[in-house]
Regions:
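Short, flexible loop segments at boundaries between secondary-structure elements
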Residues: 49-78
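Short, solvent-exposed loop/turn segments at secondary-structure junctions
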Residues: 28-32, 69-72, 89, 101
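Glycosyltransferases and closely related glycan-assembly transferases
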Residues: 38-52
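Proline-aspartate-enriched helix->loop->beta-strand connector
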Residues: 10-31, 36-39
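C-terminal regulatory/interaction regions
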Residues: 48, 94, 103-151
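Single conserved hydrophobic/aromatic residue that forms the stacking wall/gate
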Residues: 1-9
Length: 151
């Protein structure tokens, strides 16, 4: 617990130094590797510490949660959708492929045999298709976010 507290203070100090206007965290907390939950919990703990200390920069900061490759936010819960061009989607795929943990299929959520990057692209394209079907602008893909508001 002492080590965790030291890490939280270090993370809090980094946030205080940067004073970000936006923080992006994984909202897919059922990640098979467990890393998404660990990272998200670390960010939330640092934000909570900053809040306890009365950090003024927090009122100008939004925390956005994205989903992993297995599921998307329900359309009625999406609070920000960012269009992704074909070139950006390729860059996202290449970024995913640079992570060894994403190179193989993960035994998670059923019998989906697609690789992580394939599920990710299909999810982003599916979100764009849904927005198009609702009569909104048409894009290659979209990344959807839900805002996390610390209590």
């Amino acid at each position: 617990i002492r080590r965790q507290r030291q890490m939280c203070i270090r993370d809090s100090n980094l946030l205080r130094e940067i004073k970000p206007h936006q923080i992006f965290v994984a909202g897919d907390l059922a990640d098979p590797h467990g890393t998404h939950r660990v990272c998200t919990d670390a960010v939330f703990a640092a934000v909570d510490l900053e809040k306890e200390e009365g950090a003024k920069w927090l009122k100008d900061c939004r925390i956005w949660m994205y989903r992993g490759a297995w599921a998307e936010w329900e359309i009625e819960n999406i609070e920000m959708a960012v269009p992704i061009s074909p070139e950006e989607l390729r860059a996202k795929r290449n970024s995913i492929l640079k992570h060894q943990s994403q190179m193989e299929s993960a035994p998670f959520l059923g019998n989906d045999e697609r690789l992580f990057w394939q599920r990710s692209e299909d999810r982003n394209r599916g979100t764009a298709t849904l927005y198009d079907q609702l009569g909104l602008a048409s894009y290659e893909a979209m990344e959807a976010f839900v805002e996390y508001i610390p209590l």
